[in-house]
Amino acid sequence: GSSFCDSKCAVRCSKAGVQD
């Protein structure tokens, strides 16, 4: 969700398995 994973950490969150 953009409220949790903004454009800056989208890749990091993706690698961490965190839903955007």
UniProtKB/Swiss-Prot annotation:
It comes from the Eukaryota. Keywords: Allergen. Expressed in pulp (aril) of fruits (at protein level). Belongs to the GASA family. This is Pommaclein. It comes from Punica granatum (Pomegranate).
